[in-house]
């Protein structure tokens, strides 16, 4: 019979199970396990014991994932999504990641609106489901005018993808105020503007999705991107606060919020 002599292995399995239990439940559930950890090390000499502990760890991990999914969806479901009726707004979508998002939506014939000061490639607009509005999202009046026109001519958007962003590759002491304010206006403050314009209609219907494009720089900065990293880190707080307000202040549990950490951006 398979025999494990390592005295430390028993502690390893128990630690894995405890960590998973902490995520799935709470620290209170860990007290019995913590007591076991304080006991003298006992060797695992039986295959059944090792197998049992492995199954427990896997089970707790699966339970944790299931509970996390429920939490992210506010413990509710929404079967009303019909992509032939949904309307998506994407900011900064004339190039880069935004353009790719629009391309994928166009392939699915999902009605999509680009808000960008720079026009997209003409080939994109040949798709009847894609529309373009020349909008500087740092100017609230332009955003508001575009939002009203979309709502009047079509309907209220149900998905908002705040994709627009700019970079600034300079040492902090070499930046000037104009550059820094422009970066903050595009990367951070514009998202307050677009959400204030498009979210009320979503709340009214308790149906919608807000996507925030953050970055790996939200957590890991480096030289010459201090301002950029700060703007992206602020989006984490924006996303988390928005999600809480939707549930606690507006009772709009079916409106989803997604935070995207784009690598190398």
Swiss-Prot record:
Catalytic reactions of this protein: a primary alcohol + NAD(+) = an aldehyde + NADH + H(+); a secondary alcohol + NAD(+) = a ketone + NADH + H(+)
Membrane topology: Multi-pass membrane protein
Presence of the UniProt keyword Signal in the record: no
Membrane-spanning segments: 6-26, 47-67
Glycosylation sites: 45, 74, 127, 176
Keywords: Glycoprotein, Membrane, NADP, Oxidoreductase, Transmembrane, Transmembrane helix
EC id: 1.1.1.1
GO CC terms of this entry: membrane
Primary location recorded for the protein, binned into one broad class: membrane
Pfam families the UniProt entry points to: adh_short
GO molecular function, one term: alcohol dehydrogenase (NAD+) activity
Signal peptide from the UniProt entry: none
Pathway of action: Mycotoxin biosynthesis
InterPro entries: NAD(P)-bd_dom_sf, Sc_DH/Rdtase_CS, SDR_fam
Deleted gene: phenotype: Significantly reduces the production of T-toxin and decreases the virulence to maize.
SUPFAM superfamilies registered for this protein in UniProt: NAD(P)-binding Rossmann-fold domains
Binding site for NADP(+): 89, 136, 163, 228, 232
Subcellular location: Membrane
Domain of life: Eukaryota
Active site positions, chain numbering: 216, 228, 232
Family listed: Belongs to the short-chain dehydrogenases/reductases (SDR) family.
Its job: Dehydrogenase; part of the Tox1B locus, one of the 2 loci that mediate the biosynthesis of T-toxin, a family of linear polyketides 37 to 45 carbons in length, of which the major component is 41 carbons, and which leads to high virulence to maize. One of the PKSs (PKS1 or PKS2) could synthesize a precursor, used subsequently by the other PKS as starter unit, to add additional carbons.
Name under which the protein is recorded: Dehydrogenase RED2
Source organism (scientific name): Cochliobolus heterostrophus (strain C4 / ATCC 48331 / race T)
